[in-house]
Amino acid sequence: MEVLLGTSALEPRSYLVTVTEHLERLGHEVRVFSAEPLPSPEELRVVGVERDLPLAPDVIYSQDAEAALLLAHLYPLTPQLFATHGDRQDVWLPPQLAGVVARVVVFDDRTGERVRAAALPQQLIRLRRPVDLDRIVARGELPDRPAKARVQLDGVSDYRRGIVQRVLADARIELDDDADLVLGRGSAVVEALAEGRAAYVYGDDGGDGWVTPERYELLEADGFSGRAEPSATTFERLRAELEDYDPALGPAGRELAQAHDARAHAQELLAAFDEVKPRRDPVDAPLRELARVVRLEAAAARRAHTHAREAESARTRATELERELAEVRERNEQLAREVEELRRQAEEAAALEEQRLERQKSRRFGPRR
């Protein structure tokens, strides 16, 4: 089978690499389409609108709305599946246009609910986030107390990141990739489980704590996003839960990761590919223009997100500077009080010295006449 993976900019990279490798292991030919011209990573065979497009792939597996629309235009009769990688950004949702995609793959129940809430009904395929258990080897026995932590918080606010840094510093835990525990969300948690490390779910919207066998189903259904339970992750809570670290979480996590085996994921994808049939008619819509609009909207959303992060960082820095300024002012006032006290003491000492000298003169020369 010839499979064309559709992307706008080769994202999400780790998923593309994992799926491509395991489909190719089974003898299938895989190319990755990138709407944006980008350098081709060694692990992927990248094609674009202007170069090396396959003549007639058997199936298209798109990872975002822009790629789905553009490839539906380029291959009007080729069946297409769509992978929804999250519920936060609209670009991850399938196009709300009948006939563009035949099936939608979701990786957690939360995202599935988001897709079902959209106007266009979709047939969903529920898979788990894959991890390459052949490539990732368990690190071995964990220590009784954690000494090193890996923090994977891409896109998390400075405030939330700061809580983690303060907690780890208070617990005397160093930052190191060769860690005993991992704090993160999504695929970072799945990889931590596969590595046999203790995994703590923590993101911008909350923290759900340690991934244990008892809580795995709840946290996996939520996509390890940190939003499974409505609770606030304060410094005090995170610091207290860090004390619940258990070295047994390592081997237990490796066992839980078996449910995310990339080999099984590839086989489930192929079964879904076999089920879809070619379109009988092309989609009657200006697909290329819609793809352009989606691309511009996604770019605007990214810029807005970047500006929001920068504004938040600026506010955080302004708060820090205000606190530092207040501390400097308080210190200056304290120093001014100390200087004033020293001046008073000096004046008193000078007055006493003058009195002493006067007494000495009186004793030596007698009273003035």
Locations of regions flagged by a protein language model:
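N-terminal strand-loop element at the rim of the active site
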Residues: 5-54
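Short His-centered aromatic/hydrophobic patch
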Residues: 61-67, 84
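Helix-loop-beta element that forms the nucleotide-linked donor phosphate-binding surface
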Residues: 73-77, 112-130, 332
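Acidic anion/phosphate-binding donor-loop and adjacent secondary structure
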Residues: 91-95, 113-117, 130-146
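A short, active-site helix/loop in glycosyltransferases that binds the activated sugar's phosphate group
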Residues: 91-92, 102-122
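A charged, aromatic-enriched C-terminal amphipathic alpha-helix characteristic of glycosyltransferases
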Residues: 118, 228-288
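Catalytic binding pocket for nucleotide-activated donors in carbohydrate/polymer assembly enzymes
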Residues: 187-248
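Boundary detector for helix-to-coil junctions that initiate low-complexity/charged tails
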Residues: 279-369
